[in-house]
C-alpha cells in the first residue's frame, strides 16, 4: 500500500463503496498516477482506512474501503487564537500549527488588527493538506472572527497561554 493519505469528509466504514470528488480524483489519477486496483488511505473522525480503486470513469475515482488501519483518537483540545497577519505568514502559521496538533483556530479582532478578512476556503485547504501530510486523523476547525474581549469573556475558565515577542519573560 502506498503512503498517499486523503481526507474524506463523509463517513467511512468497512466495505463502503463511494466516489472521490473531482480535485481528489485528479490528484490521485493525474498527479500520483494511481490506477485501478491500487490502494491508498482515507481518514476522518472515523479513523484511517485502506481503500482500493474499483473504477475510474470520466476522471472520477470510485473506491471500496477494504480495511481499517487505525481507530479514531481523542486528541487533547489545543486552540490557537491569533490576530491574522499577512497572507504568506498566516498560511505558514496555519500549516505548522496543524502539524503540531492544534485542534481549533480562532481568528481574533483587536484594535490593531490590519487583516480583517480571511479566505476561509484557502485556509481550510491548507489545514486539510497539513493534516494529510502529518498523519493526523482529526482535521482542525477554523472559527469565524471573534473580538478579543468576547473571546476572553467566553473562556474565563480555560487555561490561556499568551505569547508576546516584545516581552523578556
Language-model regions, residue ranges each:
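RNA substrate-binding interface of SAM-dependent RNA methyltransferases
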Residues: 71-162
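N-terminal positively charged helical leader segments and presequences
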Residues: 1-71, 121
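Short, glycine/charge-rich flexible loops or terminal/linker lids adjacent to PRPP-binding catalytic cores
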Residues: 169
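Carbohydrate-associated surface elements
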Residues: 166
